């Protein structure tokens, strides 16, 4: 099967040496270092390993799983082993998603260079593969898995095993008939093109053929006019359909004569439907398409909570890898929890827990290196400063020396601003969000201060009433920084209000060290994002400025949305807000970010190390606009006079009816690859996330024993009150009557990026990785609800 990509795969001396194989040390920790024989397979797309050369090998990874290859010094683990192995002999393979990195140490610098250069060449090839090349690679991977004795050909017994691996339940007699038809050499085995023909016989699409014949006058081709009719009637392409039809024929018609005659064959039609142009996600939303010149507070900002953690909140590992992965997936606001460290060097970790420590300077170096690899729009450092004056000065030194010109240290024009700058204004800049020493003119009147104290006390009491068990040190109410008494008057009243209020039966925290005084040099680095305590919306309007930002626990934010959602919307129209998960989420679980986006909260911080529905929503929202990490909020969330209440939305919103016909599925993966004989019973669930009245879900019935090409043909109908805020999540599950249905794949996207018509939805894994070629085929139709229907 290696022939499928022959002539297209890059070939050089590095790859030839990799195909011969190399003994290298696989390193997991200081105590776990094992010699393994790694070899690039003949297909050029997979790497297998064995305990020794010639030993029984098993798959290690596919090139398509590799995100990048890093040199020795970029690995924390390899740096720690520098005395044992020369750094130049090591390298790190970084995978997409949440899969752990693979650290390897070669026997020589030359061998390490061979593998690094070869892998980088192959990763570049895979990144630029077209649709056909991706399918060829997928087929090659399956052939490798099915060819149990690795002789380059497949017997009927191996084909039967492969069918079960591919989720195909097929009558043995019919399968043998297809096998014999494909075996044109009559050798009793399938190889090369024969296997491809066998696969094609399995993947006939009668539902697409029926659709094709509906618009084709002769059932053989679509003329230009017939294709234009299809694009206008079904795909809702409007006036651009004529020009688009010519583009699509030129792009997807495999026959050169067909291109010249401006006709589309069945193969070309299917190619279009399976392509990005036939995807449910509108291709016009992929590039940067939104206005990026509005103030920062007008955007949703992709934000991370406890970015340094790659595990749970109590004993998990802290690593610069958390920052690298967050930034590379488009995150624009990262959290840095800084504490006094040994030898005068600040450290980053989750305070008062058993999580591991990392040097602050390593975190800053990683941020400086990766901040703008995915997006060149501004990165916000949300500093949680717990350091002494002396180590705060070290923080300032590392930030300024390592980040250099990337760090924003003064207002853009040198003048007092009247509103927050835009993402466009701040391209390539890193901003510090944190405490700032008060200026003389910012001091509050005693009456206002007393009112703030009372409101803060009420807020805290309400939070204790609703969550008496929430005693986590992550609570914002327990980590305030006292300002320098030499530069501003004491804040005794505020400190009293900010301390935990004791109640009968509640344990108090152990006594902590006196809180640190804020270093003026660190305060000076906070230019536009001064962190302030929230007391009430009235207090914020009367005493705060547009460049001040407040943080809210999820509990507090939910309470505010319920009690005064319209005021929260108005607040977020002129000031930035950050929402963070409850301290009770010690397992690094996530909340539903949608309810906070509904109120216009910009920085809804997520535990990005934890996959699941909540991260699917986050990835879905920020999939648009080039994945730059900034998404413009709807206009009614940018209006400081807005009357919109996320809990009770009313007109002038134009409600929409959404009609989804779930037609079929293609090449759905197994839930558990270890169960070769198990075949999934798939169903499709469509979930809507938006304002409370819009949040709902419906699902199809399940198809028994068919994950390869299930057919549903069922219609689901929804009524959406505020489509501007709606996210759609398509989930495929494996039905199980005895227990919870198992997850197979999902895809999430904003309503505003959804295309109508016949569309394929290309499924993603729990980690957000492509499950190509797994997809579901649907028909989407939206209709505006008439005033009569609404009344």
From Swiss-Prot:
The keyword Ligase does not apply. Its main location: membrane. Residues 16-124 form the PH domain. Residues 638-765 form the C2 domain. CDD domains: C2_PLC_like, PH_PLC_delta. Residues 522-638 form the PI-PLC Y-box domain. Binds 5 Ca(2+) ions per subunit. Two of the Ca(2+) ions are bound to the C2 domain. Its cofactor is Ca(2+). GO terms for cellular component: endoplasmic reticulum; nucleus; plasma membrane. SMART domains: C2, EFh, PH, PLCXc, PLCYc. It holds the Pfam family EF-hand_like. Residues 134-169, 170-205, 207-237 form the EF-hand domain. It is found in: Membrane; Nucleus; Cytoplasm; Endoplasmic reticulum. A motif (GBA) lies at residues 213-243. It is a peripheral membrane protein. Ca(2+) 3 binds at residues 306, 335, 337, 384. Ca(2+) 1 binds at residues 147, 149, 151, 153, 158. Ca(2+) 4 binds at residues 679, 681, 705. Residues 290-435 form the PI-PLC X-box domain. Keywords: Calcium, Cytoplasm, Endoplasmic reticulum, Hydrolase, Lipid degradation, Lipid metabolism, Membrane, Metal-binding, Nucleus, Repeat, Transducer. It catalyses: a 1,2-diacyl-sn-glycero-3-phospho-(1D-myo-inositol-4,5-bisphosphate) + H2O = 1D-myo-inositol 1,4,5-trisphosphate + a 1,2-diacyl-sn-glycerol + H(+); a 1,2-diacyl-sn-glycero-3-phospho-(1D-myo-inositol) + H2O = 1D-myo-inositol 1-phosphate + a 1,2-diacyl-sn-glycerol + H(+). InterPro entries: C2_dom, C2_domain_sf, EF-hand-dom_pair, EF_Hand_1_Ca_BS, EF_hand_dom, PH-like_dom_sf, PH_domain, PI-PLC_fam. The PDZ-binding motif mediates the interaction with GRIP1. PANTHER family: 1-PHOSPHATIDYLINOSITOL 4,5-BISPHOSPHATE PHOSPHODIESTERASE DELTA-4, PHOSPHOINOSITIDE-SPECIFIC PHOSPHOLIPASE C FAMILY PROTEIN. Hydrolyzes the phosphatidylinositol 4,5-bisphosphate (PIP2) to generate 2 second messenger molecules diacylglycerol (DAG) and inositol 1,4,5-trisphosphate (IP3). DAG mediates the activation of protein kinase C (PKC), while IP3 releases Ca(2+) from intracellular stores. Required for acrosome reaction in sperm during fertilization, probably by acting as an important enzyme for intracellular Ca(2+) mobilization in the zona pellucida-induced acrosome reaction. May play a role in cell growth. Modulates the liver regeneration in cooperation with nuclear PKC. This is 1-phosphatidylinositol 4,5-bisphosphate phosphodiesterase delta-4. It comes from Bos taurus.
């Amino acid at each position: 099967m290696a022939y499928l990509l022959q002539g297209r795969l890059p070939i050089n001396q590095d790859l030839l040496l990799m195909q011969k194989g190399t003994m290298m040390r696989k390193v997991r920790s200081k105590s776990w270092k094992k010699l393994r024989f790694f070899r690039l397979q003949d297909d050029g797309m997979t790497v297998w390993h064995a305990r020794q050369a010639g030993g029984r090998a098993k798959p290690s990874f596919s090139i398509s799983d590799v995100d990048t290859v890093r040199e020795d010094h970029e690995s924390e683990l390899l740096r720690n082993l520098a005395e044992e192995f020369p750094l130049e002999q090591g390298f790190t393979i970084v995978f997409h998603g949440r899969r752990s990195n693979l650290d390897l140490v070669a026997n020589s610098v030359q061998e390490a260079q061979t593998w690094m250069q070869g892998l980088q060449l192959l990763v570049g090839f895979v990144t630029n593969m077209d649709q056909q090349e991706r399918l060829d690679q997928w087929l090659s991977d399956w052939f490798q898995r099915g060819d149990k004795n690795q002789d380059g050909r497949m017997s009927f017994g191996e084909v039967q095993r492969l069918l079960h691996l591919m989720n195909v339940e097929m009558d043995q007699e019919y399968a043998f008939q297809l096998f014999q038809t494909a075996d044109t050499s009559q050798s009793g085995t399938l190889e090369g093109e024969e296997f491809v023909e066998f696969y094609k016989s399995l993947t006939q699409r009668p539902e697409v053929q029926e659709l094709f014949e509906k618009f084709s006058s002769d059932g053989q081709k679509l003329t230009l006019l017939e294709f234009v009719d299809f694009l206008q009637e079904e795909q809702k392409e409007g006036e651009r359909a004529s020009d688009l039809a010519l583009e699509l024929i030129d792009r997807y018609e495999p026959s050169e004569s067909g291109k010249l005659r401006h006709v589309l064959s069945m193969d070309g039609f299917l190619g279009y439907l399976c392509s990005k142009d036939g995807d449910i996600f509108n291709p016009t939303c992929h590039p940067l398409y939104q206005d990026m010149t509005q103030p920062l507070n007008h955007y949703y900002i992709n934000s991370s909570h406890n970015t340094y953690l790659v595990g749970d909140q109590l004993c998990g590992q802290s690593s610069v890898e958390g920052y690298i992965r967050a930034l590379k997936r488009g995150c624009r606001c990262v959290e840095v929890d800084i504490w006094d460290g040994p030898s005068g060097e600040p450290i980053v970790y989750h305070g008062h827990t058993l999580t591991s420590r990392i040097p602050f300077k390593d975190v800053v170096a990683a941020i400086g290196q990766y901040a703008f690899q995915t997006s060149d729009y501004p990165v916000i450092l949300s500093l949680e400063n717990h350091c002494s004056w002396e180590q705060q000065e070290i923080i300032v030194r590392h930030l300024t020396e390592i980040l250099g010109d990337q760090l924003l240290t003064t207002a853009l024009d040198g003048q007092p601003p009247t509103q927050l700058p835009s993402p466009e204004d701040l391209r390539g800049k890193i901003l510090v969000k944190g405490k700032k020493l008060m200026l003389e003119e910012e001091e509050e009147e005693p009456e206002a201060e007393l009112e703030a104290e009372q409101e803060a006390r009420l807020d805290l009491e309400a939070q204790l009433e609703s969550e008496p068990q929430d005693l986590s040190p992550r609570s914002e109410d327990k980590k305030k920084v006292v300002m320098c008494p030499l530069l501003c008057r004491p804040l005794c009243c505020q400190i009293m209000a900010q301390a935990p209020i004791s109640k009968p039966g509640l344990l108090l925290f152990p006594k902590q060290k006196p809180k640190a005084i804020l270093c003026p040099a660190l305060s000076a680095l906070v230019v536009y994002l001064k962190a302030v305590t929230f007391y009430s919306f009235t207090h914020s309007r009367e005493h705060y400025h547009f460049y001040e930002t407040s943080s809210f626990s999820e509990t507090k934010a939910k309470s505010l949305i319920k009690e005064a959602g319209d005021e929260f919307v108005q607040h977020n129209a002129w000031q930035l807000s950050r929402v963070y998960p409850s301290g009770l989420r010690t397992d690094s679980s996530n909340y539903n970010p949608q309810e906070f986006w509904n109120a216009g909260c910009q920085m809804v911080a997520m535990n990005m190390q934890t996959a699941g529905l909540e991260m699917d929503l986050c990835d879905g929202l920020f999939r648009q606009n080039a994945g730059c990490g900034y998404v413009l909020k709807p206009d009614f969330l940018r209006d400081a006079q807005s009357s919109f209440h996320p809990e009770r939305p009313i007109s002038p919103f134009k409600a929409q009816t959404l009609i989804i016909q779930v037609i079929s599925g293609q090449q759905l993966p197994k839930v558990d690859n270890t169960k070769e004989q198990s075949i999934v019973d798939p169903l499709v669930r469509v979930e809507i996330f938006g304002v409370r009245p819009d949040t709902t879900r419906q699902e199809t019935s399940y198809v028994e024993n068919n994950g390869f090409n299930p057919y549903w043909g069922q219609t689901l109908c929804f009524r959406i009150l505020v489509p501007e805020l709606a996210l759609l999540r398509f989930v495929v599950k494996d039905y199980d009557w005895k227990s919870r249905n198992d997850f197979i794949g999902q895809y999430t996207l904003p309503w505003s990026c959804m295309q109508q018509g016949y569309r394929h939805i290309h499924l993603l894994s729990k980690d957000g990785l492509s499950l190509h070629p797994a997809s579901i085929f649907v028909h989407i139709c939206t209709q505006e609800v008439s005033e009569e229907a609404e009344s």
